[in-house]
Amino acid sequence: APIGSLVSEPQPSEEAGETGTTVCFKPDIEIFSIGIVFDYATLSARLRELAYLNGGVRIVFRDERESARDAEGNPHEEIYFYEGGIKEYVAYMNKEKDALHPEIIYVNSEKDGVQVEAALQWCSDAYSDSILGFANNIRTVDGGTHIEGLKTVLTRTLNAFAKKLGKRKESDSNLAGENIREGLTAVLSVKVPEPEFEGQTKTKLGNTEVRGIVDNLVGEALSQFLEFNPSVIGLILEKAIQAFNAAEAARRARELVRRKSVLESSTLPGKLADCSDRDPVNTELYIVEGDSAGGSAKQGRDRKFQAILPIRGKLINVEKA
């Protein structure tokens, strides 16, 4: 509840070409009784983020605390103004990276009252994705339906282009979403009339209709951009295919190690007289009938590369059977 009466000051004069409204607020010391400390870095990051999300808006951040004043007593001040909006945001995040394509892919459209704005750029020296999602200027750190829609349309669209351009055969398996998003920096901002957030912290968007809207609008704009920029789609697909091949090679290596570990650690048949050589190319396995034959075979074998396995029952001649 407010304490004290509202105080107004002279407002800007429209005749002098000044417009706008000034709103001031201070935390209630009766509620925040432990202490009030404003963290400059936190506030600066959030205001810069808002300036990126609302291109053309000028935000002035002034720290009037005594500790922040310069030698002449002037407060520390920063101005955030980004006419390019989230396109400049992506450029800012990629300034230390090697962009795969100089032009940032930009989407700005609206459907069923939902506004969708997205900026995307792949980098050759990055091997993971960096996707920032926002809903009504709120950072959705846990993702949500808008991020799901973006990931889905990226995977579908680029796989379609890969088949269309002959980069992948029809019989080949599709590129995984992680392969396609490798090196991607993206900012996705949606404006939803009636947002539904999961949890009190509003970190995940839950509107189911947003998934399809993002899929539709981003897919249309992305396909159009790639159609007119064949060199860009070629570079993106080349990186995605390299990521796919690397993932497949890593998977095969893991399976080989696991299979080898299983063979080395698993219990061998009790009556098997194994050989010492571990290379299957150089080894032989003799299957004999009964323990008596097994004993005779063990006496005459070369332990280095010959293994003996006695079994019960008569061996079937499979070729004749």
What is each of the regions a protein language model found here?
Residues A1-A321:
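GHKL-family ATPase ATP-binding module
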